[in-house]
């Protein structure tokens, strides 16, 4: 994969650092052991966070700032990591989708970064460009229908948008048939060390729960 960061993102977030994780995988419907880890993380949050204080987590606070700088209301279009943790703090379980989606969610809530998880074989081309959504740009969010991505950071392939920090696109989503994982960690707080730790956690989880092969990652700016 090649990742290009457009000038618009650099101008609103000059410290941005991302990580692109790739691996060959075998997905499954459910992992009891993985869900034990997710439930333990939820319990930790309920003992240490509130729905207000979670906004102060570095990765979440930085993503919210970028939304505002791009003209988007982060309380209406929440970063996915914030939405997931908020759901846990309300005493609700996360939606159980499949093992790949669930482990990406665990990595996201563990460190607070919004992470795009994709079936790499569904991309049009081998290059993704990170820019800002345009007014009227078509985008079908997973389980959300058509999403207004104007003012949202968005990754695009040759066909169009594939991922925002709020929701990934139906066209390139992961499923049980996914064999090529691409995960993008969005470090709007500029903390390369934590972005790397998040990428390494994804690889650890993929190797443990999805028979990961040839897993690797690289940093991009």
Q: At which residue positions do the language-model features occur?
A:
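Charge-biased, low-complexity intrinsically disordered regions
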Residues: 1-221
């Amino acid at each position: 994969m090649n990742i290009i960061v457009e000038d618009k993102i650099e101008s609103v977030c000059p410290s941005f650092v991302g990580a692109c994780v790739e691996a060959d995988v075998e997905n499954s419907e459910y992992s009891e052991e993985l869900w034990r880890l997710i439930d333990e993380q939820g319990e930790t949050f309920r003992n240490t966070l509130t729905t207000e204080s979670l906004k102060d987590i570095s990765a979440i606070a930085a993503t919210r700032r970028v939304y505002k700088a791009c003209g988007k209301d982060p309380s209406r279009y929440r970063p996915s990591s914030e939405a997931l943790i908020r759901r846990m703090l309300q005493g609700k379980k996360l939606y159980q989708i499949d093992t790949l989606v669930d482990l990406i969610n665990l990595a996201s809530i563990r460190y607070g970064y919004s992470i795009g998880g994709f079936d790499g074989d569904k991309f049009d081309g081998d290059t993704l460009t990170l820019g800002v959504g345009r007014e009227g740009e078509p985008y079908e969010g997973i389980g959300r229908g058509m999403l207004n991505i104007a003012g949202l950071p968005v990754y695009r392939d040759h066909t169009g948008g594939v991922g925002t920090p709020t929701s990934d696109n139906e066209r390139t989503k992961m499923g049980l048939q996914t064999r090529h994982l691409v995960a993008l960690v969005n470090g709007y707080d500029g903390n390369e060390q934590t972005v790397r730790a998040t990428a390494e956690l994804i690889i650890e989880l993929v190797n443990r729960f999805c028979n990961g092969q040839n897993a690797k990652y690289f940093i991009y700016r």
